[in-house]
Amino acid sequence: MPYLLEMKNITKTFGSVKAIDNVSLRLNAGEIVSLCGENGSGKSTLMKVLCGIYPHGSYEGEIIFAGEEIQASHIRDTERKGIAIIHQELALVKELTVLENIFLGNEITHNGIMDYDLMTLRCQKLLAQVSLSISPDTRVGDLGLGQQQLVEIAKALNKQVRLLILDEPTASLTEQETSVLLDIIRDLQQHGIACIYISHKLNEVKAISDTICVIRDGQHIGTRDAAGMSEDDIITMMVGRELTALYPNEPHTTGDEILRIEHLTAWHPVNRHIKRVNDVSFSLKRGEILGIAGLVGAGRTETIQCLFGVWPGQWEGKIYIDGKQVDIRNCQQAIAQGIAMVPEDRKRDGIVPVMAVGKNITLAALKKFTGSISQLDDAAEQKCILESIQQLKVKTSSPDLAIGRLSGGNQQKAILARCLLLNPRILILDEPTRGIDIGAKYEIYKLINQLVQQGIAVIVISSELPEVLGLSDRVLVMHEGKLKANLINHNLTQEQVMEAALRSEHHVEKQSV
């Protein structure tokens, strides 16, 4: 039986750099292939070649789809063939309805007039196919990220898709939304639709894949049956070496209390009747890693936004640093108290995409390079930039390159470098490894461990429970704005954390760390 897709000996160069070097990929109808590799390995470049974003003639090699050679000059050419890609950054127009998004550019018309009745009927069938119980007239901006992801799939199905490419589809989804999405992909597989699945979440890769293809440094390392591979096997192929322990287990001691929060309550920015954080109190010691776990809507991010002075709504409570009550109402006041934060959404809140990597790193610490006459010392700034890039192992061709062109992992390292320039005593990390590859995660985990050994106190918020449990000395469990448990991490399990989140009473372990 012929393959649905064959990519033969694909090579793509940018100047003298080979982003893809003689890579081949093939899959059958109804097959799910996971494409794995570190950020910058060439996965996205390969998919852009396949989809026509990089047109025929700009690369070497051959693409055969459904028995015919594809020589696409535009993404529309491959869409007509039945190839659709859904990027991590969804391409929906939030101001339009679900129906309008699904049929955007593919409207059903009769004599130049759109047939809304027929489109509504078709839209309802597509939504049912992806198990989405919403009205076609719902505004996309009113949907959650998980629902928007399913609308994207419905949009692809409307184009008679035969091959669906999903790039980091669950990076911003809850566990429940992820489970729904994986079930939808399996259902599409039963209807003969093939899928190329790109994800750094190896548990998902193992759960969904028939075959796993690994790319490293632009080269094809190997393709194997998923059933015969462990997560460690995938990691070794991706990074070219064994990671003996993903989470550093180097001992570190905690000091005295550096931070205490008492009776923190925060209200919704618009609806004052809704409490997003409800009477939360906790403390933090020097050299301690404090994890905050909870389901979406638990109030984790809202809590630390109050601490960093960036919560947009009203809040009340007391913050003590070194035993003294402090008033923090903006990020400048937080920084002055020795607090730095890596935000949850790095693209929205963490970087200026068009600004140079170096300028992003020094953005919050320009006073360090400003003399008495308010003139910037360019030489001192450049020296600091180069030292930060080297220390954090930020992979960039130049400090002057726009940071938006870096991989997610290297953007995150640059944000961390900016935080460290502030010489923080308390470092807040909100989803520190979201959407970055396993190698970059490992480097960030090692850095966190080094920081706490220097006495810096770290707060880690993550939707990935293994990450919280692998890093933290102590875990706060939140649910619906309330602190449900304060647990010492003595071999804590995911089940214990979830049980604590959902139990009715508050639970605190009183042992010292």
Curated annotation (Swiss-Prot):
Topology versus the membrane: Peripheral membrane protein
Catalysed transformations (reactions): D-xylose(out) + ATP + H2O = D-xylose(in) + ADP + phosphate + H(+)
Keywords in alphabetical order: ATP-binding, Cell inner membrane, Cell membrane, Membrane, Nucleotide-binding, Repeat, Sugar transport, Translocase, Transport
Coarse class of the protein's main subcellular location: membrane
InterPro entries in the cross-refs: AAA+_ATPase, ABC_carbohydrate_import_ATPase, ABC_transporter-like_ATP-bd, ABC_transporter-like_CS, ABC_transptr_XylG, P-loop_NTPase
An example Gene Ontology molecular-function term: ATP hydrolysis activity
Boundaries of every ABC transporter domain copy: 5-242, 259-505
Record flagged with keyword Cytoplasm: no
Matches recorded under CDD domains: ABC_Carb_Monos_I (cd03216), ABC_Carb_Monos_II (cd03215)
GO CC terms of this entry: plasma membrane
Binding site for ATP: G37, E38, N39, G40, S41, G42, K43, S44
Transmembrane regions: none
Top-level enzyme category: translocase
Record localization: Cell inner membrane
Documented EC number(s): 7.5.2.10
UniProt xrefs under SUPFAM superfamilies: P-loop containing nucleoside triphosphate hydrolases
SUBUNIT field: The complex is composed of two ATP-binding proteins (XylG), two transmembrane proteins (XylH) and a solute-binding protein (XylF).
Family, similarity comment: Belongs to the ABC transporter superfamily. Xylose importer (TC 3.A.1.2.4) family.
Function according to Swiss-Prot or TrEMBL: Part of the ABC transporter complex XylFGH involved in xylose import. Responsible for energy coupling to the transport system.
Name recorded for this polypeptide: Xylose import ATP-binding protein XylG
Organism: Escherichia coli O6:H1 (strain CFT073 / ATCC 700928 / UPEC)
